[in-house]
Each structure stands twice: as C-alpha cells, then as structure tokens.
Amino acid sequence: MAVDYSLYLVTDRILVGPKDFLLSIRKALEGGVTLLQLREKETNSREFYDIGVKVKELAAEFGVPLIINDRVDLALALDADGVHVGQQDLPLAKVRNIIGPDKILGYSVSSLEEALQGERMGADYLGAGPVFPTGSKKDAAEAIGLAKLKEIKAGVSLPVVGIGGIGAANLRVVKETGIDGVSVISAILSQEDPCAAAKGLVDLWRN
C-alpha cells in the first residue's frame, strides 16, 4: 500500500477528553491528516478494542490508514493497517512474523544505529525522535535535534517521520532535513480547532 506520511497524527484521549475524542479525530481527518495512529496507554484491552472499532470506521471514511501503537494483538483483532512499535516492545522481526508481509510496520528510533537495525529487521517506516523536547510523552527520551534527524534520513532507504515537539512554528526547518513527514499530537489535538490546525500544517508542509 502506498502511504502518505506527511501528516501523521498520534491520538491522545487524555489530552482531549473521552467526550471530544472522536470529534477531534474527525476534525483532524477533515483537515488533511494522512496517517493515523491510535495510542492508548491508560486503557484495558477491551476498552482499547471498542475505541479502535470506532476510530477504524472514521479512518476508513477518510481513506486514511490506521496504525495501532504497541499492541500487536489489537492491531490484528481490529484488522488495522499496521502497528508501530518501540525499542522496548516485541522484537521487530517477531512483530513482522506475526502481522505478515502486507501490514505497515513502524519502528521508533533515536539514532542511526537503531534506524539501520529497523531497516534490516523489516520496518516499513521509521519514527525518529524526539526531535525537540515534548510534553506529550512522559517517557520521552532526550531530544535528538535536527542534525541527527538529517543523519538518520540520509542513512536509510526507508521513509522517516520526525516525532516530538513538532508544530507550526518549526515544521519548515524539520522538513528541510529531507524527511517524509511529521508526527504530531498536541499541534493538532491541543488546538481549539483541530481541523484548522491540521490544514495549517498541511499547507506548511506542501508550500
């Protein structure tokens, strides 16, 4: 499947509140989000699944692929388009064996060494970061900066998405590293109008 990585939204139900969660995602999709990741760190498996069913319907309505964060089992149960795993999750090669060759497999990296490992082990794309300090992830590592992001992109043949602290104010300089897209949370979901926020980011990326 051809994937547009340019504006990759990672969800945060705690940030927007359960009541406004689906509406915020709909507005973000209306604004031009090209890839969606469902990330649920604070819920049990059943609740995650129930939320996932609704989010998958929304993503399908807009023709946007749905990626599940970490939970390979739920990605399969939901028949999502793919799964994104990090350094502390199941080994990448094992995840690829489980999900098969056709699902999208994303991998979080913070160095060229990790990126090369991801490429060898069967990742379809890399999420590199955090590029800048971020408040959206409590467990975020130290920021890697633009130079290292550029190094990662230059060192692999896979699509690379910049993650962490990216928003309207710095998107242009991030794009100049040559990466294929940006992953955001608060730059869309913390804004008063997620649709307008997404449109603004799309315009910055394309122009």
Swiss-Prot record:
It comes from the Bacteria. 4-amino-2-methyl-5-(diphosphooxymethyl)pyrimidine binds at residues 37-41, 69, 108, 137. Its EC number is 2.5.1.3. Keywords: Magnesium, Metal-binding, Thiamine biosynthesis, Transferase. Mg(2+) binds at residues 70, 89. Belongs to the thiamine-phosphate synthase family. This is Thiamine-phosphate synthase. The lineage of its organism: Bacteria, Bacillati, Bacillota, Clostridia, Eubacteriales.
